[in-house]
From Swiss-Prot:
EC numbers for this chain: 2.1.1.182
Gene coding for it: rsmA
Lineage per the UniProt record: Bacteria, Pseudomonadati, Campylobacterota, Epsilonproteobacteria, Campylobacterales
Name under which the protein is recorded: Ribosomal RNA small subunit methyltransferase A
EC class (word): transferase
Similarity section: Belongs to the class I-like SAM-binding methyltransferase superfamily. rRNA adenine N(6)-methyltransferase family. RsmA subfamily.
Length: 269
């Protein structure tokens, strides 16, 4: 019997119904599946019934087990198994062609990995298991108290959907929190919206400023980095009141403020 390791945040999904619902939520047109965290291979097994799969597993002790379990699939090249930290591999790309990500993510790296998937031009979308609170943040809409920078980033490329909750007793060992499965099917790419990757990175930094102190108004947050008179002029132009908080805006308004600040900056050069 394999004992889950705390250092890897391992909680193995054993609920057959939840596994089936994850498979059903993957778009029919998905061709290449990348899985992060093959674990004991329960989800991997279900994925291989429909798709070609490339799985990343960080736990060396599980690699030999997975090689044995999926020996036939490895031999006929329907399955590719990679040992290592997916976050480190992401620097050079998880896959050399378009793919759809499926993952039961360790809670401690879930947000970071989803943001990587959002930024990855080759990633067409994802179905991911995360802590319920994280799921609510990614899927939050303008006006929700959970709405934040990561909600905006997800909204840029498509609509992040909260699919279903998964209780703690669906896992072995059972985590101390409730989990949830979310899905993002990308409908836009970075160059559909931004001039280049530099502008996109600048926009992400801009969002960090906007949400730096959620209880303060967006005007107060932005005025720590930008001239207040210029901000007031932009807000007036966009017909926005200065007492708005960041969670009350949407991507379109954030982008309009960002673009106007950029135009002002270029004029002053």
């Amino acid at each position: 019997m394999y004992i889950a390791k705390k250092k890897f945040g391992q909680n193995f999904l054993k609920d057959k119904n939840a596994l089936n619902k994850i498979i059903e939520s993957i778009p029919e047109n998905a061709e290449n599946i990348v899985e992060i965290g093959a674990g004991l291979g329960d989800l991997t097994y279900e994925l291989l019934r429909k798709f070609k799969v490339k799985s990343y597993e960080i736990d060396k002790d599980l690699i030999e087990f997975l090689k044995s379990k999926f020996a036939c699939e490895l031999e006929n090249r329907k399955f590719e198994l990679v040992f290592g930290d997916a976050l480190k591999f992401w620097k050079n790309g998880l896959c050399n062609k378009n793919y759809f990500l499926v993952a039961n993510l360790p809670y401690y790296v879930a947000t970071n990995m989803i943001l990587k998937a959002i930024d990855d031009e080759l990633c067409d979308g994802f179905v991911a298991m995360v802590q319920k609170e994280v799921a609510e943040k990614f899927c939050a809409e303008s006006g929700d108290s959970e709405f934040g920078g990561i909600s905006v980033l997800a909204d840029i490329f498509g609509k992040c959907e909260f699919l279903f909750s998964v209780p703690a007793d669906s896992f072995e060992p059972a985590p101390k929190v409730v989990s949830a499965v979310i899905r993002l099917k990308k409908t836009r790419k970075i160059d559909d919206i931004f001039e280049n990757s530099v502008q996109y990175e600048n926009f992400k930094n801009f969002l960090k400023i906007c949400f730096s102190s959620p209880r303060k108004t967006i005007m107060k947050n932005l005025s720590t980095k930008f001239d207040k008179e210029i901000l007031q002029s932009i807000f007036e132009k966009l017909d926005l009141t200065t007492n708005l908080r960041a969670h009350e805006l949407n991507f379109t308004l954030f982008f309009k403020i960002f673009k106007n600040l950029r135009i002002r900056d270029e004029r002053n050069k």
